[in-house]
Design a protein with these regions (language model features):
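Compact, glycine-rich, soluble single-domain proteins
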Residues: 71-116
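Bacterial N-terminal signal peptides that target proteins for export
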Residues: 1-10
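Short, well-ordered strand-loop elements centered on a beta-strand within folded domains, enriched
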Residues: 128-138
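Short, low-complexity Ser/Thr-rich regulatory SLiMs
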Residues: 123-127
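Sec/Tat-exported extracytoplasmic proteins
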Residues: 55, 62-66, 80, 166-173
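A short acidic/glycine-rich loop-to-helix N-cap element
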Residues: 141-157
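Bacterial N-terminal signal peptides
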Residues: 10-19
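Terminal, regulation- and interaction-focused segments at domain boundaries
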Residues: 26-63, 68-70
Length: 174
């Protein structure tokens, strides 16, 4: 169990470390989904509401539904003000989405999979930036924690869908 706990702790830190190390893309370049071992990252330009709408449309086109949007920026901005600290984001949302058929198959394969559900996208704008960054954990990376061939197969399918969703958004926005 210790190994799994360490792996899960590493999973939570990796998005932060990767994003701190990333540079921004050049103006006018074709936006594509950046793939690391752990993450899928897309950066686009535009108002966050347009990006969220494009994401919701793409999610529905892949037969998923949006389970909710957590507006972390509102709460964290108030908390930062209470502590007298700066808040480094103009916007920070977590968009949750799910495909019920795949969720059912996954939970039948391993009920522990529920700890990783639903799919989530961090959608944020750094203070003063015109770019919106969208980040997802790679389902194939997370699925390794469960060591189930069926879960890994489903994770590959979900990951292909997440990449397709991000590619649709990249095609629709600058």
């Amino acid at each position: 169990m210790r190994r799994r706990g360490s792996a899960l702790a590493a999973v939570t830190l990796l998005p932060v470390l990767l994003l701190l190390a990333r540079g921004s893309g050049e103006a006018g370049e074709r936006r594509s989904v950046e793939r690391t071992e752990e993450l899928l990252v897309l950066t686009v330009k535009g108002p966050i509401q347009e990006v969220l709408t494009a994401l919701q449309t793409a999610i529905a086109r892949r037969n998923y539904f949006v389970a909710g949007i957590n507006h972390l920026d509102d709460t964290l901005r108030r908390r930062a003000a209470d502590l007298g600290k700066p808040f480094d984001f103009d916007h920070y949302k977590i968009l949750s989405f799910c495909n019920l058929t795949l969720a059912d198959e996954g939970l039948r394969a391993d009920p522990n999979l529920g700890a990783f559900m639903p799919c989530r996208l961090a959608v944020f704008v750094r203070k003063g930036s015109a770019e919106v960054t969208i980040v997802a954990m790679r389902p194939t990376f997370v699925s390794r924690a469960l060591q189930s061939p069926e879960v890994q197969r489903l994770a590959a399918q979900v990951e292909a869908d997440v990449v397709a969703i991000l590619e649709m958004v990249a095609a629709d926005l600058p």
